[in-house]
Amino acid sequence: MAMKVKDIVFMNKGDGENSYVKSAGLTLKVIAKTQPIVQKAVQSLFTGTHSTPLQVVNVADLGCALGPQPLESMSIVIESIVEKCGELGCEMPEIQFHLNDLAGNDFNTLFKGLSVVQEKYKNVSWFAMGAPGSFHGRLFPRNSMHLVHSCYSVHWLSKAPKITSEAGLPLNKGKIYMSKTSPPAVREGYLSQFEEDFSSVLRFRSPELAPDGRMVLILNGRQSADPTEKDICYLWDLLAEALSYLVSEGLIDEEKLDSFNVPYYNPSQEEVERVIDKEGSFTTEFSDTVVLEIGGKNAWSDPGLRIKGYRCFSEPILSHQFGEEVMDKLFDKAEEILAEDYKQGKEATKNISIVVVLKKKTNQTWT
Amino acid sequence: MAMKVKDIVFMNKGDGENSYVKSAGLTLKVIAKTQPIVQKAVQSLFTGTHSTPLQVVNVADLGCALGPQPLESMSIVIESIVEKCGELGCEMPEIQFHLNDLAGNDFNTLFKGLSVVQEKYKNVSWFAMGAPGSFHGRLFPRNSMHLVHSCYSVHWLSKAPKITSEAGLPLNKGKIYMSKTSPPAVREGYLSQFEEDFSSVLRFRSPELAPDGRMVLILNGRQSADPTEKDICYLWDLLAEALSYLVSEGLIDEEKLDSFNVPYYNPSQEEVERVIDKEGSFTTEFSDTVVLEIGGKNAWSDPGLRIKGYRCFSEPILSHQFGEEVMDKLFDKAEEILAEDYKQGKEATKNISIVVVLKKKTNQTWT
């Protein structure tokens, strides 16, 4: 049976040692770095052609996961609106957040965390809903969303690209993502799946956005045209190496490793823009590539922390393919390799994000 | 520290033997019996003074819990709209469900169940959100809801009534709810807390309803003026008797039993109507008392099934007060007493519901 991404792509649940709640510090750094862009997009909702000021601002967070990240994004939106309304002297609208993720996401933990935001913004009238479902399909009613926001989600594909020979044999043996040694068919398969999926994210959002609505999408991407550049392949190469070690130890089947590819893609800014133009529902108001230094003296200076950062989002999918029982061994081995790479300065040192702000084209209003 | 109802009132989680998902069959019967009333209220949304037909129908289910009950309520709403639109020859609107319960509710299990409805209504454009929070406060933006529905939730109080003597001593010793032997202060305390809480449910919903919006509230209530009539006190008297047995066995402290009262109230139709009139935001379009026969040859013919039905909603709150470790013993003892009562025909034989359909008064439109 084909792997159903919707059942296995989620962030580690709860708030334990390896949970996403505890370990997704990098996403928080990306949120902090891109805050001015989100703020500007939010505030542009108040300077458009609306005949009356918005009474309710509907905000969606696609693939929000759980923990401090969605809460931080909510705070940024609330503060941006408070600031803008202060500036314009207009009455504060009510704000309704729609926190979206696949139904396998730990919404119970997400909801319990909302009290933090409640404490922080007692004087603002805001509401939070959980919206379970895939952003590769419809999620919200027509013309309902003023701001659709997503940080580090839409680089997840709806399924792993099909990368086999005509005879059905795996073409990406010993690897789980694009790599320097992968044949061209692997890169082509990944790019093609990304184009299809990212295009569907845009197509399904288009009817859902209110006129003049904005989308801010932040994807984990890459800087160069080369889809196998070290900074993006490093993580998956590292895990593939650790998996190969487990194969050599007889702990997992070689066939399981050879046939597996992660449903994830790091696009370049140019690839993102090309899909947006081709899909046609949105105008690009802003587009940029944002670089964060990692490793060394920066974030993730410690291999242990970095492995936790990798584990909290890759474990559910790896555990589904290779078994829960080998996960500790897998990440221990990966940490060992990473520590050695740190000594030799071989680890990836950059985290790349592609950020776009999109506006719904006016002729796209659905009735 | 005062007991916080929002942390302890929830239905048993998951889908195990004592779960609400498996054991809340009585609520399903209430939903089936009141279906024509809900249907009529939904369809009345399409025959009002709306200048244009609704494009999106926003529906809220207050205190929806989890399992088949909220899914069944969604089905009734969808089918009512499909039928009405067929009749009127109008285009189907999109439907957005807001499934509300306290943040302690098991939303993860609730969301996983949505696939059942998805399979059933593939050709209808509907969306479901989880809306965590207390219905004794604001939950949704202004003027947003067309239908607010609630089955067997708003009889839960925001807190247990304070029933002590002037010296602070408990007045409802050995009981956990109103009972034949309770002094008048107990009944007064309960009624007063219900009036305050039910009034706040109405007051907080009023700004949230769209013009011409409807509320359908179904409460577990009583038939007569006497708030200690057998059919409503039976459950809590039974549990109090089982708790007293555990006290006599030294398994729980007498003081814990004496000071405890459940935050629950079974109002009469007249009490419900009086609060609605006094609060003033809504016109009552329909009001009735609905009786279901239980026990004997009807639903819950078996004491074991009936105890599971009681346990799935009372366990979290009892377990918080008396400890998880005594729950099996408590419900075993209660089943023993119940079985004896069945033999002697002493058990409650009626389940009473109060049903009201309310329309937002036109001068209550909030801007």
UniProtKB/Swiss-Prot annotation, chains A, B:
Pathway recorded for this protein: Alkaloid biosynthesis
Involved in substrate discrimination (site feature) positions: 149, 220, 264, 324
Listed GO biological process terms: methylation
Cofactor: binding comment: Binds 1 Mg(2+) ion per subunit.
Keywords, in A-Z order: Magnesium, Metal-binding, Methyltransferase, Transferase
Pfam families xrefs: Methyltransf_7 (PF03492)
MF-aspect GO terms: metal ion binding; S-adenosylmethionine-dependent methyltransferase activity
The name this protein goes by in its record: Probable 7-methylxanthine methyltransferase 2
Lineage: Eukaryota, Viridiplantae, Streptophyta, Embryophyta, Tracheophyta
